[in-house]
Amino acid sequence: MSTFVQKPAEVEKKWIIIDAEGLVVGRLATIVATRLRGKHKATFTPHVDDGDNVIVINAEKVAFTGKKYSDKKYYWHTGHPGGIKERTARQIIEGRFPERVVEKAIERMIPRGPLGRRQMKNLRVYAGSNHPHEAQQPTVLDVAALNKKNVRSA
Protein backbone atom coordinates (compact mmCIF):
# COMPACT_ATOMS: atom_id res chain seq x y z
CA MET A 1 0.00 0.00 0.00
CA SER A 2 1.66 3.20 -1.14
CA THR A 3 0.73 6.84 -0.68
CA PHE A 4 -1.62 8.22 -3.33
CA VAL A 5 0.00 10.86 -5.52
CA GLN A 6 -2.16 12.62 -8.08
CA LYS A 7 -0.75 13.56 -11.46
CA PRO A 8 -1.69 16.84 -13.16
CA ALA A 9 -3.44 14.94 -15.99
CA GLU A 10 -5.81 13.27 -13.48
CA VAL A 11 -7.11 16.54 -12.00
CA GLU A 12 -10.84 17.24 -12.31
CA LYS A 13 -11.69 20.89 -11.77
CA LYS A 14 -15.20 22.08 -11.01
CA TRP A 15 -16.59 25.60 -11.22
CA ILE A 16 -18.05 27.05 -8.02
CA ILE A 17 -19.89 30.34 -7.55
CA ILE A 18 -20.15 32.08 -4.17
CA ASP A 19 -22.36 35.07 -3.37
CA ALA A 20 -20.36 37.21 -0.93
CA GLU A 21 -23.21 39.52 0.08
CA GLY A 22 -23.23 39.91 3.88
CA LEU A 23 -20.43 37.37 4.44
CA VAL A 24 -17.53 38.07 6.81
CA VAL A 25 -14.37 38.66 4.74
CA GLY A 26 -11.97 36.38 6.64
CA ARG A 27 -14.37 33.47 6.87
CA LEU A 28 -15.18 33.74 3.16
CA ALA A 29 -11.46 33.91 2.32
CA THR A 30 -10.59 30.73 4.25
CA ILE A 31 -13.30 28.74 2.47
CA VAL A 32 -12.26 30.07 -0.96
CA ALA A 33 -8.54 29.49 -0.28
CA THR A 34 -9.26 25.89 0.74
CA ARG A 35 -11.22 25.34 -2.48
CA LEU A 36 -8.52 26.95 -4.64
CA ARG A 37 -5.80 24.73 -3.15
CA GLY A 38 -7.93 21.57 -3.41
CA LYS A 39 -7.63 20.67 0.27
CA HIS A 40 -11.33 19.79 0.41
CA LYS A 41 -10.70 16.81 -1.90
CA ALA A 42 -9.55 13.35 -0.87
CA THR A 43 -7.13 13.45 -3.80
CA PHE A 44 -5.20 16.49 -2.47
CA THR A 45 -1.55 16.47 -3.46
CA PRO A 46 0.59 19.40 -2.20
CA HIS A 47 2.59 19.91 -5.41
CA VAL A 48 -0.33 19.66 -7.89
CA ASP A 49 -2.88 22.36 -8.76
CA ASP A 50 -5.89 20.29 -7.71
CA GLY A 51 -8.25 23.12 -6.70
CA ASP A 52 -11.51 24.23 -8.23
CA ASN A 53 -12.26 27.36 -10.23
CA VAL A 54 -14.02 29.80 -7.89
CA ILE A 55 -16.21 32.77 -8.87
CA VAL A 56 -17.05 35.30 -6.14
CA ILE A 57 -19.84 37.78 -6.89
CA ASN A 58 -21.09 40.80 -4.90
CA ALA A 59 -17.62 41.37 -3.43
CA GLU A 60 -18.51 45.00 -2.70
CA LYS A 61 -21.16 43.85 -0.20
CA VAL A 62 -18.88 41.86 2.13
CA ALA A 63 -18.99 42.52 5.87
CA PHE A 64 -16.34 43.21 8.48
CA THR A 65 -16.67 42.48 12.19
CA GLY A 66 -15.91 45.04 14.86
CA LYS A 67 -14.49 48.36 13.65
CA LYS A 68 -12.40 46.84 10.85
CA TYR A 69 -14.45 48.57 8.14
CA SER A 70 -13.13 51.95 9.27
CA ASP A 71 -9.91 50.98 11.12
CA LYS A 72 -8.29 48.14 9.13
CA LYS A 73 -5.43 49.44 7.00
CA TYR A 74 -3.98 47.98 3.82
CA TYR A 75 -0.34 48.90 3.17
CA TRP A 76 1.81 48.82 0.04
CA HIS A 77 5.10 50.35 -1.02
CA THR A 78 5.69 52.26 -4.24
CA GLY A 79 9.34 51.26 -4.42
CA HIS A 80 10.58 54.81 -3.88
CA PRO A 81 12.17 56.03 -0.63
CA GLY A 82 9.45 57.00 1.82
CA GLY A 83 6.86 55.45 -0.49
CA ILE A 84 4.79 53.52 2.05
CA LYS A 85 1.09 54.01 1.33
CA GLU A 86 -2.01 53.01 3.24
CA ARG A 87 -5.76 52.89 2.74
CA THR A 88 -8.55 51.77 5.02
CA ALA A 89 -10.97 49.01 4.07
CA ARG A 90 -13.70 51.64 3.76
CA GLN A 91 -11.69 53.65 1.20
CA ILE A 92 -11.02 50.55 -0.90
CA ILE A 93 -14.62 49.26 -0.85
CA GLU A 94 -16.01 52.69 -1.71
CA GLY A 95 -13.30 53.22 -4.36
CA ARG A 96 -12.81 51.99 -7.92
CA PHE A 97 -11.92 48.36 -7.20
CA PRO A 98 -13.95 47.08 -4.21
CA GLU A 99 -13.21 43.45 -5.13
CA ARG A 100 -9.57 44.01 -4.13
CA VAL A 101 -10.39 43.51 -0.43
CA VAL A 102 -11.59 39.95 -1.09
CA GLU A 103 -8.74 39.23 -3.53
CA LYS A 104 -6.07 40.32 -1.03
CA ALA A 105 -7.65 38.37 1.83
CA ILE A 106 -7.62 35.19 -0.27
CA GLU A 107 -4.19 35.86 -1.81
CA ARG A 108 -2.62 36.18 1.63
CA MET A 109 -3.98 32.75 2.61
CA ILE A 110 -2.46 31.01 -0.43
CA PRO A 111 1.23 29.96 -0.27
CA ARG A 112 3.58 32.28 -2.11
CA GLY A 113 5.38 30.65 -5.02
CA PRO A 114 4.81 29.36 -8.55
CA LEU A 115 2.01 26.96 -7.53
CA GLY A 116 0.28 29.62 -5.43
CA ARG A 117 0.32 32.04 -8.35
CA ARG A 118 -1.19 29.38 -10.62
CA GLN A 119 -3.91 28.65 -8.05
CA MET A 120 -4.76 32.35 -7.76
CA LYS A 121 -5.45 32.42 -11.51
CA ASN A 122 -8.39 30.07 -10.81
CA LEU A 123 -10.09 32.83 -8.80
CA ARG A 124 -12.47 35.35 -10.35
CA VAL A 125 -13.87 38.13 -8.14
CA TYR A 126 -16.58 40.54 -9.31
CA ALA A 127 -17.88 43.58 -7.44
CA GLY A 128 -21.44 43.18 -8.73
CA SER A 129 -23.69 40.21 -9.39
CA ASN A 130 -22.89 39.92 -13.12
CA HIS A 131 -20.21 37.52 -14.35
CA PRO A 132 -19.29 36.12 -17.79
CA HIS A 133 -18.99 32.46 -16.70
CA GLU A 134 -22.50 31.08 -17.29
CA ALA A 135 -21.13 28.75 -19.98
CA GLN A 136 -19.10 26.87 -17.33
CA GLN A 137 -22.34 26.05 -15.43
CA PRO A 138 -20.93 26.79 -11.95
CA THR A 139 -22.48 25.10 -8.92
CA VAL A 140 -23.60 27.39 -6.11
CA LEU A 141 -21.82 27.07 -2.77
CA ASP A 142 -23.91 28.57 0.05
CA VAL A 143 -21.23 29.74 2.49
CA ALA A 144 -23.83 31.37 4.75
CA ALA A 145 -25.43 27.97 5.45
CA LEU A 146 -22.13 26.31 6.42
CA ASN A 147 -21.84 28.18 9.73
CA LYS A 148 -23.97 30.91 11.29
CA LYS A 149 -20.83 32.94 12.08
CA ASN A 150 -20.05 33.29 8.36
CA VAL A 151 -22.78 35.95 8.07
CA ARG A 152 -22.59 39.29 9.82
CA SER A 153 -25.79 39.92 11.75
CA ALA A 154 -26.82 43.57 11.77
From Swiss-Prot:
Pfam families: Ribosomal_L13 (PF00572). Keywords: Ribonucleoprotein, Ribosomal protein. The keyword Iron does not apply. GO terms for biological process: negative regulation of translation; translation. The keyword Membrane does not apply. GO terms for molecular function: mRNA binding; structural constituent of ribosome. One of its GO terms (cellular component) is cytosolic large ribosomal subunit. Belongs to the universal ribosomal protein uL13 family. Part of the 50S ribosomal subunit. This protein is one of the early assembly proteins of the 50S ribosomal subunit, although it is not seen to bind rRNA by itself. It is important during the early stages of 50S assembly. This is Large ribosomal subunit protein uL13. The lineage of its organism: Bacteria, Pseudomonadati, Pseudomonadota, Alphaproteobacteria, Hyphomicrobiales. The gene is rplM.
